[in-house]
Regions:
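Short amphipathic alpha-helical segments, especially helix-boundary/capping motifs
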Residues: 23-28, 40, 76-78, 100
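A beta-strand edge to alpha-helix "cap/lid" segment located at domain peripheries
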Residues: 2-5, 9, 15-16, 33, ...
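Short, solvent-exposed secondary-structure junction/capping segments
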Residues: 8-12, 24-38
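Short beta-edge strand/loop motif at the mouth of beta-sheet-based domains
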Residues: 29, 39-49
Length: 136
């Protein structure tokens, strides 16, 4: 399977919000780097990280417009969005969307690194307005 095909499956599994299926495509030493440069290392830690994020934003989604492959690296340009849950409620005013890019490293058909580039201001504005605290 080409690296781009692996990443398309990874994006699809993010949209399914099934952390176990998502983890199946991560290498044991998977590395996640968020848009602030914070890193989570390891498949099991990232499985828990995704579970926490899907609790925080239960309808989180990603989409792609452009994908470029260079060897085992894949660059994805698209958008992400969802609704921030506040006290378990998904209110329309807590819906967000942001242009997003991802850079992935694929080895042996698994995602070894997933790096996010996004402007998180829409999420921060919702958190500030609602006094919501992410639960991870």
């Amino acid at each position: 399977m080409r690296p781009t095909e692996t990443i398309l499956q990874f994006l699809d599994r993010i949209n399914q919000r099934d952390v176990n299926k998502l983890a199946e495509l991560m290498s044991e030493d998977h590395r996640f780097v968020d848009s602030l440069g914070q890193t989570v290392q390891g498949r099991d830690k990232m499985r828990a990280g995704w579970q926490g994020y899907f609790t925080f934003c239960p309808d989180y989604w990603v989409s792609h417009e452009e994908i470029f492959e260079d060897g085992n690296r894949v660059a994805v340009f698209g958008s992400a969005g969802g609704t921030i849950a506040v006290s378990g409620n998904l209110l329309p005013e807590n819906k967000w969307r942001a242009n997003t890019a991802w850079l992935a490293v694929v080895e042996n058909g698994l995602v070894k690194e997933w790096r996010v580039y996004a402007d998180n201001k829409p999420v921060y504005d919702i958190l500030a307005r609602s006094k919501a605290v992410p639960q991870a």
